[in-house]
């Protein structure tokens, strides 16, 4: 009795003891849980034993909705649905293949005027184009159009050539003007302007001043002192007359005799006061 009751409970559900932990509690048709927790959905084709794989999902509700969409496509509105209340509110969505298979018919194209529209069915052949060109040559329109186009192209090329010439001339003038404005400078002058080298004209007066400056006393003694032994002759001094020698001598009578042993004494301050009285 227990076996029969247990079988009735799992009549339409997934296989007992297989799949994930919540597989036994799932009541959705075509939905089961993997051992690692993912939910998968499958559906059986009508009048066939084969199953169609619908994919794996994070929740059981998503897998049930995928099963319902597949059932509506395969069995129509009479199909068994896991979530019928959701399918009634929403229309059956069209697949991507059905959305982009629409092609306009000839009747739809004929509704639009031909002027200003691209004729899809027009496929001109090379023979028709050659005939049209020959007709234009005979009438002379083609030669006129060719001459006008050639003249326009020549004028464009001439104007472009002149523009290039003028631009080149302007650039050359700019370079020439730049050369005239900036003359060449000697290297020595450039270094003198920077202050690295000194001017020769400035150096000459300093050299002249150095030449005219009196030499130091050591050089005077060595070169041209009046009492140098080489320039002074003792013979001329001996030959000089006595009168000249006496004039050269100092008059000792004018100076008082001074003895180093004498005591130098100054007048007292009382003598100064007595002279004032």
From Swiss-Prot:
GO terms for cellular component: nucleus. Its main location: nucleus. GO terms for molecular function: DNA binding; DNA-binding transcription factor activity. PROSITE patterns: AP2_ERF. It holds the Pfam family AP2. InterPro entries: AP2/ERF_dom (IPR001471), AP2/ERF_dom_sf (IPR036955), DNA-bd_dom_sf (IPR016177). It is found in: Nucleus. Keywords: Activator, DNA-binding, Nucleus, Stress response, Transcription, Transcription regulation. Residues 27-84 bind DNA. Gene3D superfamilies: AP2/ERF domain (3.30.730.10). Residues 144-160 have a biased composition (Low complexity). SUPFAM superfamilies: DNA-binding domain. Residues 162-171 have a biased composition (Basic and acidic residues). Induction: By high-salt stress. Residues 1-24, 144-180, 203-231 are annotated as: Disordered. Belongs to the AP2/ERF transcription factor family. ERF subfamily. Transcriptional activator that binds specifically to the DNA sequence 5'-[AG]CCGAC-3'. Binding to the C-repeat/DRE element mediates high salinity-inducible transcription. This is Dehydration-responsive element-binding protein 2F. The gene is DREB2F.
């Amino acid at each position: 009795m227990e076996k029969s009751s247990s079988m009735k409970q799992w009549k339409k559900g997934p296989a007992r003891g297989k799949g994930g932990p919540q597989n036994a509690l799932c009541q959705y048709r075509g939905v089961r849980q993997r051992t690692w927790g993912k939910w998968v959905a499958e559906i059986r084709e009508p009048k066939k034993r084969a199953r169609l794989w619908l994919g794996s999902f994070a929740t059981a509700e998503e897998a049930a909705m995928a099963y319902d969409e597949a059932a509506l496509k395969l069995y129509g509105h009479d199909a068994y649905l896991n979530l019928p209340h959701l399918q009634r509110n929403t229309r059956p969505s069209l697949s991507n293949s059905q959305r982009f298979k629409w092609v306009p018919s000839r009747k739809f194209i004929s509704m639009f005027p031909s002027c200003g529209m691209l004729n899809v069915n027009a496929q001109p052949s090379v023979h028709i184009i050659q005939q049209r060109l020959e007709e234009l040559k005979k009438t002379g329109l083609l030669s006129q159009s060719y001459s006008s186009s050639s003249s326009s192209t020549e004028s464009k090329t001439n104007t472009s050539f002149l523009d290039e010439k003028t631009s080149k001339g302007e650039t050359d003038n700019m370079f020439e003007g730049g050369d005239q404005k900036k003359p060449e400078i000697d290297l020595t002058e450039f270094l003198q302007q920077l202050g690295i080298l000194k001017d020769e004209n400035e150096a000459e007066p300093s050299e002249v001043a150095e030449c005219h400056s009196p030499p130091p006393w050591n050089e005077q003694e060595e070169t041209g002192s009046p009492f140098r032994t080489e320039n002074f002759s003792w013979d001329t001094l001996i030959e000089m007359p006595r009168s000249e020698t006496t004039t050269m001598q100092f008059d000792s009578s004018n100076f008082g005799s001074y003895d180093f042993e004498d005591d130098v004494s100054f007048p007292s301050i009382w003598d100064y006061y007595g002279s004032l009285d």
